Every structure is written in C-alpha cells, then in structure tokens.
C-alpha cells in the first residue's frame, strides 16, 4: 500500500487545482461509472485513461452535459505497481435485472388479482339468476324481540321522527344499531300512511300488528248475550211440555226383544227384566 501512495503523490501538479469550470469539455468521472464513488481532485490523474487528461467537475454550459456516456476503460494499479484495464462490460447490465423484476412483478400481480375458488364461491351468493336475469339477494330481515318492539312502539306513539341524538340513545338502550332503528321507523310511517290512505281505522284506534302488548283478538260477547233470546213467561206450559217430551222419549227408549214365548224389556234407566206373557196383557 505504501508503494501505491508513493506513486500517486508525484502525479499531483499545480495545474490540477485549476478552476473546474474553465474546461467546457470536462465532465465528472462519477457520471461515467455508476459503480465508482465521486473522485476528488487528487484522484483525477490517478484514474485518467491516458494519464495526461485531467477531469474536473461538470460545467453547466458543457456540451456533454446530459448526454449518455459510453463505456470506458480506466486504469487500476495493484500492490506490485502493475497496471491493467478494467472493462465496464465485465459486469452484467443493470437493465436486465430491472426487466426481469418488472416481468416477475407483473406475473405476481396477475396471480394475486385472480380470486381463489373459495373466495369466488363466497361472493357468488350475492347475485342469483332468476329467469335468466341476475337478482341481488336481500339481506336477512332483523328479528326484533318483544321488549324491543314494545319500546319502539311507545316511542313511535310519542313522535314519528327521531333526531340523531335521540335515535342513537334509543339504539344504544335497546342493543340495536341506528340503521335498524331508522328502518323500523320508516316502515312504521309507511304502514301508517297506507292505513290512512285506505280509509281504515284511525291510528289511535287501530291496534298495531308489531306491538306484542296490543290485544288483537276479537272481543268476547257479553255473558248475557250468550243465553239467547228471552223466553216468554209461560212457566206452567213449559213444564208440561217438558214432561210430555220426557215420556215420549222414555217410550222410544224401551226396546222389545222376543225369544220364544218371552219378551225382554229394556227400560230406561237401563234395568233389564223379563215379563211373563199374560192373557193378552203386556206390562
């Protein structure tokens, strides 16, 4: 290493410290080789191709400023003092790596953009084909509990429109989202307008179908209505009619059975006995 420094010291001349902007044809050596660090004024003669041309900084008015630079060969000195030429084409071109990287990145993006079969199966139920036409599947309806419906109905009777803070408070107290509360009030208002338009019962007299506390069953008739029309006060005649009807039914209830020369009579209340056949008299 000492030999290298000895050979470099004499190469420094006063002319090397000239103004770098005086030579319009000179350019910075770091622009020629992307692999070498920026060289100083002491390295310009050490890395010069011909040994006598000194490189300075690039002038803004230079004709070579901004032009593509060709590959060059620069000298290097070993430890033993021998020098040689290093070709810039001995290393692979950086553009080939860049092209290969972009090709691989494009292929990777195309592979990632294609959804997997499992993801495609998950997204397909959102659209269903009905009669050859796509139809969007509706989300399942929200099932409200009895407590939630009762609270919503009471609030709707007080006011049909809720402000944003009131809606947020009601949703938090019932364990619902603000969207669910808003949709319930919208549906309730639509039903109410439809009832009013059809000329049905007024809202205050029409029981709500969504209110579990409302009694929607028909009213039971009064106790005195179930007894039927009042009968005229003919009690003696009614008693006689009932007695005659009972006797007629008793006669019809008697069954005559005959077996040989005997008759078996079954009388109401179910007593079975036999009677002897008398002289033309039947008991």
UniProtKB/Swiss-Prot annotation:
Sorted alphabetically, which SUPFAM superfamilies does this protein's record hold?
Homeodomain-like
Protein name per the record? Homeobox protein Dlx5a
Q: What are the subcellular locations of this protein?
A: Nucleus
List the molecular function annotations (GO) for this entry: DNA-binding transcription factor activity, RNA polymerase II-specific; RNA polymerase II cis-regulatory region sequence-specific DNA binding
What family classification does the UniProt entry report for this protein? Belongs to the distal-less homeobox family.
Does Nucleus show up as a keyword for this record? yes
Q: What is its main location?
A: nucleus
Q: Which keywords accompany this UniProt record?
A: Developmental protein, DNA-binding, Homeobox, Nucleus
Q: Which GO terms describe its biological process?
A: cartilage development; cell differentiation; embryonic skeletal system development; embryonic viscerocranium morphogenesis; fin morphogenesis; medial fin morphogenesis; neural tube formation; olfactory nerve formation
Biased composition of type Polar residues is found at 19-45, 206-220
| Organism encoding this protein | Danio rerio
Pfam families assigned to the protein according to its UniProt record, in alphabetical order: DLL_N (PF12413), Homeodomain (PF00046)
Annotated segments matching region Disordered: 15-47, 198-237
Listed under GO cellular component are:
nucleus
Highest taxon above the source species: Eukaryota
Residues annotated as DNA-binding are 137-196
């Amino acid at each position: 290493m000492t030999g290298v420094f000895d050979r470099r010291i004499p190469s420094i001349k006063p002319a090397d410290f000239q103004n770098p902007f005086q030579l319009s044809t000179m350019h910075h050596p770091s622009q020629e080789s992307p692999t070498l660090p920026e060289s100083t004024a002491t390295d310009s003669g050490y890395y010069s191709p011909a040994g006598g041309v000194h490189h300075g900084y690039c002038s803004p008015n230079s004709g070579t400023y901004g032009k593509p630079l060709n590959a060059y060969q620069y000298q290097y000195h070993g430890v033993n003092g021998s020098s040689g030429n290093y070709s810039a084409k001995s290393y692979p071109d950086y553009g080939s790596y860049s092209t290969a990287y972009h090709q691989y990145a494009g292929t990777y993006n195309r592979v990632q953009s294609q959804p997997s079969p499992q993801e495609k199966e998950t997204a397909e139920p959102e659209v269903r084909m009905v009669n050859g036409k796509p139809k969007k599947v509706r989300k399942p309806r929200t099932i409200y509990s009895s407590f939630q419906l009762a609270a919503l109905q009471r609030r709707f009777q007080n006011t049909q429109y809720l402000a944003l803070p009131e809606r947020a408070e009601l949703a938090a107290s019932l364990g619902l989202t603000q969207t669910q509360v808003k949709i319930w009030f919208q549906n309730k208002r639509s039903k109410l307008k439809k009832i009013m338009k059809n000329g049905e019962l007024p809202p205050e007299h029409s029981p709500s179908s969504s209110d579990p506390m409302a009694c929607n069953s028909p009213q039971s008739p009064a106790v005195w209505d179930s007894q039927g029309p009042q009968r005229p006060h003919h009690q003696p005649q009614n008693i006689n009619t009932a007695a005659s009807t009972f006797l007629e039914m008793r006669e019809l209830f008697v069954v005559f059975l005959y077996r040989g020369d005997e008759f078996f009579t079954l009388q109401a209340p179910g007593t079975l006995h036999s009677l002897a056949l008398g002289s033309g008299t039947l008991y």
